[in-house]
């Protein structure tokens, strides 16, 4: 394999790797959006659950654990 052929092969590999990195970056961005949406929904559901629990037993205060 000549030096020129090796250079072409390396350039092809770099181009393929750049494409893969771009694709992975896009997927990661979409996953973070999904995680953020799910986190917001979980917080809303947790708050709603605590409200309903308080309504069911109004004389017993419900507080979130310290790690919330």
UniProtKB/Swiss-Prot annotation:
InterPro entries: SlyX. It comes from the Bacteria. HAMAP family: SlyX. PANTHER family: PROTEIN SLYX. Belongs to the SlyX family. NCBIfam families: PRK00736.1. This is Protein SlyX homolog. The gene is slyX.
């Amino acid at each position: 394999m000549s030096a020129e052929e090796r250079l072409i092969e390396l350039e092809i590999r770099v181009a393929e790797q750049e494409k893969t990195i771009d694709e992975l970056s896009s997927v990661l961005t979409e996953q973070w959006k999904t995680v953020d949406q799910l986190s917001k929904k979980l917080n809303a559901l947790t708050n709603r659950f605590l409200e309903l629990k308080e309504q069911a037993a109004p004389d017993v205060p419900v507080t979130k654990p310290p790690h919330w």
